[in-house]
A protein has these predicted regions:
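N-terminal Lys/Arg-rich, disordered targeting/topogenic segments
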Residues: 1-12
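Extracellular interdomain linker/stem segments of modular secreted and single-pass surface proteins
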Residues: 464-465, 554-561
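Short, exposed coil/turn segments at beta-strand boundaries within extracellular/luminal domains
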Residues: 450-452, 541-549
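Aromatic, loop-rich ligand-recognition surfaces of beta-strand-rich domains
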Residues: 357-416, 423-467
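Active-site beta-strand->loop->alpha-helix modules in alpha/beta enzyme cores, enriched
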Residues: 13-20, 26-221
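Solvent-exposed, low-complexity, repeat-rich "mucin-like" stalks and linkers
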Residues: 469-507, 569
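Extracellular/luminal low-complexity segments enriched in Ser/Thr/Pro
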Residues: 524-531
């Protein structure tokens, strides 16, 4: 009897201890969530960008792999869709080099569903992963052995779904299918992967641009807005800077990591200051990485460990380069006194030779070079009907030692425009003049050069300025260039220099404080008194108050700052624990237990200098 009583008391004591532990954990979680809710308060934060500008617009994302969509559009596509855009996400390959197509495609659909985008908005072209298909080499799927497009169980590849047959794995067929899917849906906006250091990113980028060349030359009335983005340098391999007092914007990759360190980006003609910066929906932001919608989506890509790179991928903006599609030269007849005229209106800024894989790929098949002995060095552009022209854009041979130093444009009406030295890095040199009407042809003649004179592209526009189809203003920290949302300052900060990014670089804007005490605006600088706590600041485009951005600025006390620093340590720990959980889940869900154990054993062998496995 006495023994039973003792056992019951022990059980009761154990239960009490367990309940106390559970309550303690719940209390910690409640405190954590309360503090996080305070930090994440977006009351007063607002931007007009996603409200209605994409309603009834068609937006298409074109990427190589199932997860690349999150790298280039994961933070902007969901708010577009939620605000009325008709979206399509096109995956060019099955991502099936080491993992089955079914696994990759299931992960992609699950991830997009986490962002509110349904499965029926997803298209799989079904081409192989990790091959040299793009340069004409024979290709097959590493995981399935197939030599034609296919999809995993329960999915269909685009070519079979559209035409009833699978397409052979050839470069030409991939270009055909990209062209077909674009013309079938005719998107208003295309967000496409750009040429970076990944072989499939390079190949799909070039394939897309070849498809766009065909479209622009045969569909003169269809000129979608094209925004291109680097998936590796600006996301997957970017700086892991999520854990900061305020969210950081995308940073330029260190030059030594580029395909050619001579240039700012992997595409020589892109300048960092010319990038298009789209803001992030405030609802997707959090000081906890686990709360960010992008992380929740990345967590669905178990096989790729994509979630491990969230610190690099999640930023305060999404960065693109605009590629104009309205050039009059796409439907013009172009001839040259020497060189290859076909390269001058092909939409492609760069090309490759016999490989897309490996570091420092040689860029070729993109510049039309004049013969050294050619005394004329002239390009002639003839239109099929009279045009109005107000701008000619010239892209120099991007070899830094080969530059056109001067030239002249002569129009069929006899008028001439002098051309200064072109940008040596091959970036766009815009020659703008008063509109010339009834132009049927013009020539560009090189008058001075060094090295090998040549051109990458020649474009002509009716309107010098380009309308992106949307209006945007976004406040930023003028000193760091980071976009601002709910901004926290430390106790000793006395001022904050504000700037703004506008979709129209020529647009003026007005900044004003709409709420808050003990703060004043001196020019574009917020000046805080010692007793400042919080304010709300609004920026509006001059003449268009419907285009606005609104931010909050809050000062942390010394206690709050210390609390925040402790909070961030907890956040980092929670992130590490969750990534470990997801790695373990991947081992069992995708059946990688043996492979992981084998890799672990091999790592031990390498360290010990012995061989115990086969």
């Amino acid at each position: 009897m006495a023994e039973n009583v003792k056992r019951k008391k022990k059980k009761r004591a154990v239960l009490i201890v367990l309940m106390a532990l559970v309550l303690a954990v719940l209390a910690v979680v409640c405190v954590y969530e309360t503090e996080l809710n305070k930090l994440d308060s977006n009351d007063g934060v607002d931007n007009s960008f996603y409200d209605s500008q994409f309603k009834n617009k068609k937006v298409m994302v074109i990427v190589p792999h199932e997860d690349d969509d999150l790298l280039i559009s994961g933070q902007v596509l969901p708010p577009m869709y939620k605000n009325g855009a008709d979206v399509r996400v096109v995956f060019a390959t099955n991502g099936d080099k080491r993992v089955s197509a079914y696994t990759r495609q299931s992960e992609a659909c699950n991830a997009l569903e986490k962002l509110g985008i349904p499965r029926e908005k997803v298209i799989f072209l079904g081409y192989p992963d990790g091959t040299q298909l793009y340069v004409g080499k024979k290709a097959y799927s590493f995981s399935s052995g197939r030599d034609h497009t296919y999809a995993g169980k329960g999915f269909k590849d685009y070519h079979f779904d559209r035409f009833g047959t699978h397409a052979k794995y050839t470069a030409e067929n991939m270009v055909d299918d990209i062209e077909s899917v674009v013309l079938e849906y005719r998107p208003d906006y295309i967000l496409a992967i750009d040429f970076d250091t990944h072989t499939d990113h390079r190949g799909v980028s070039i394939s897309f641009e070849k498809a766009m060349e065909r479209i622009l030359k045969k569909e003169s009335g269809y000129t979608p807005k094209v925004l291109k983005c680097f998936g590796y340098s600006l996301a997957w391999k970017s700086k892991p800077d999520f854990y900061a007092l305020n969210i950081k914007s995308t940073v330029m990759q260190d030059r030594e990591k580029n395909n050619d360190p001579s240039y700012e980006t992997d595409v020589p003609q892109y300048r960092w200051n010319n990038r298009v910066r789209l803001p992030i929906d405030k609802k997707s932001l959090s000081h906890s990485i686990l709360r960010c919608s992008e992380y929740k989506a990345l967590s669905q890509h178990l096989s790729q460990y994509a979630y491990c790179y969230s610190e690099r991928i999640i930023n305060g903006d999404s960065v693109y380069w605009n590629r104009r599609t309205d050039s009059l030269t796409y439907n013009a007849d172009i001839s040259v006194s020497s060189g290859d005229a076909s390269l001058l209106n092909d939409f492609r800024l760069i090309g490759v030779g016999n490989r897309t894989a490996g570091p420092n790929v040689k860029l070729e098949n993109c510049v039309s070079r004049f013969d050294k002995n050619d005394a004329q060095k002239t390009v002639t552009v003839k239109f099929d009907s009279p045009k109005t022209v107000s701008c000619v854009s010239l892209y120099d041979n991007f070899g830094l030692n080969s530059n056109i130093l001067g030239g002249v444009i002569t129009f069929n009406d006899g008028s001439k425009v002098e051309v200064p030295a072109l940008n040596a890095d091959g970036s766009e040199t815009r020659v703008v003049f008063e509109p010339k009407h009834n132009i049927t042809s013009f020539t560009f003649k090189v008058t001075e050069y060094e090295g090998v004179a040549g051109l990458d592209e020649i474009e002509a526009f009716e309107n010098a300025d380009y309308d992106m189809g949307f209006s945007l203003i976004k406040l930023k920290n003028a000193d760091t260039d980071d976009y601002i949302y709910n901004y926290l300052i430390t106790p000793d900060e006395k001022s904050l220099n504000l700037g703004a990014y506008a979709s129209d670089p020529n647009a003026g804007y007005t900044i004003k404080i709409i709420e808050g005490d003990s703060v004043k605006l001196e020019g574009n600088t917020l000046v805080f008194d010692d007793d400042f706590e919080k304010c709300t600041v609004r920026a509006e485009l001059n003449g268009d108050p419907s285009t606005y951005d609104q931010i909050t600025v809050k000062r942390l006390s010394e206690r709050e700052l210390k609390s925040y620093e402790s909070f961030e340590k907890v956040n980092k720990t929670v992130f590490k624990i969750d990534t470990l959980r997801l790695k373990m889940k991947n081992l069992f869900v995708n059946g990688y237990v043996y492979e992981e154990l084998n890799d672990f054993v091999k790592s031990l062998e390498k360290k010990a200098g012995i061989e115990i496995s086969e």
